[in-house]
Regions:
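C-terminal motif of bacterial Sec signal peptides marking the signal peptidase cleavage site
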Residues: 15-16
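Repetitive helical segments and hydrophobic/amphipathic motifs
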Residues: 11-12
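Buried hydrophobic residues that stabilize the cores of well-folded domains
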Residues: 19-311
Length: 311
């Protein structure tokens, strides 16, 4: 459903978890996106997303996908249910077979579950906080554990994200592991359970740098922003209220106009550098109406497509 739910937003941000969950939230409909149209470099439609609003907030989303300008499949409908002004449930897919549920404590997201058409299980996310900042997100789902000996056993797969906040820096450590049905960690598996460390540098409500370190590689992303309104930021708290979404650069206060990507393997065998550039056209209120995407690699700049916003 993350693909279905406003995919161009990559879901939504909570800048200060809990603040946007107040029942007195006043949604300013004129600032929220009503329609998003994506086209490829040839001008052919790729995706059209429209929203239905009630009481100043979206209650449904219609998503249509295209190949060479021709729609593929039927329009997908997502329905959003609220408890007060907090998102409680999102249903989508055939016979609402895809579903997200959200649970809160003191206005903060404490747990969420997701069910997908392609999976026969439910994935659970659990959230912990210190001083109103998210410190741990634990993802879990049932799985078959494949042992190095060649055997298998039933168990649970976990991905744990731990966050340390220090001024304008956030450090995330991500680890994966598996437990048997008795809750004991299984070590002799064929799964890759390495540790990934991600360092975020923040400035003015935006992520300006992101460095990902693994055992084998380093990936650095550096972001440059405009000073205008980001429509993604304006959708705060309406869809997926996951507080970690504030660490996604394209969910920041302003719009990304340049992203420099640098991937280096620690063995020295490979290095990749390229640049994304976004050129914006704005309305009178300072919101983007058209965004043109370009990529640049080895000195060659290429137009990739456009995204159009209607408010």
């Amino acid at each position: 459903m993350k693909k279905i739910l406003f995919s161009f937003l990559a879901t939504v941000v909570l800048v200060s978890c809990g603040d946007k969950g107040d029942d007195n939230v006043d949604y300013q409909t004129n600032r929220l996106v009503k329609k998003v149209t994506s086209k490829n470099k040839n001008g052919n439609l790729e995706e059209v997303i429209t929203f239905t609003f009630q009481g100043g907030r979206p209650i449904s989303q219609h998503s249509s996908y295209y190949k060479d300008g021709v729609q593929t499949g039927t329009t997908q409908v997502t329905t959003i249910h609220y408890e007060g002004n907090l998102v409680k449930t999102e249903n989508a897919g055939r016979k609402n077979f895809e579903e997200n549920n959200y649970f809160y404590e003191n206005g903060k997201l404490s747990r969420s579950t997701e069910k997908r058409e392609r999976n026969d299980y439910t994935t659970t996310y659990e959230y912990s906080y210190t001083n109103n900042q998210v410190t741990t997100v634990l993802k879990s789902y049932p799985t078959t554990i494949y042992l190095k000996s060649g055997g298998t056993q039933s168990g649970t797969r976990y991905t744990e994200r731990q966050f340390t906040h220090n001024g304008n820096t956030v450090i995330e450590v991500k680890t994966g592991y598996e437990k048997d049905l008795n809750g004991v960690v299984v070590t002799n598996t064929v799964s890759s359970n390495g540790t990934q460390t991600i360092t975020y540098t923040l400035s003015g409500g935006n992520v300006v740098k992101k460095v990902e370190e693994t055992e084998y590689s380093t990936t650095t992303r550096e972001y440059t922003y405009d000073t205008k309104h980001n429509p993604r930021y304006e959708m705060i708290g309406i869809f997926n209220p996951d507080p970690t979404k504030t660490l996604e650069a394209y969910n920041g206060k302003n719009n990304v106009i340049k992203e420099k990507y640098n991937y280096t393997e620690k063995s020295g065998s490979r290095k990749i550098v390229f640049i994304y550039t976004n050129e914006h056209t704005y309305n009178a209120d300072g919101y983007p109406t058209i965004v043109k995407l370009y990529t640049e690699e080895n000195g060659t700049r290429e137009f990739r497509g456009t995204t159009e916003y209607e408010y």
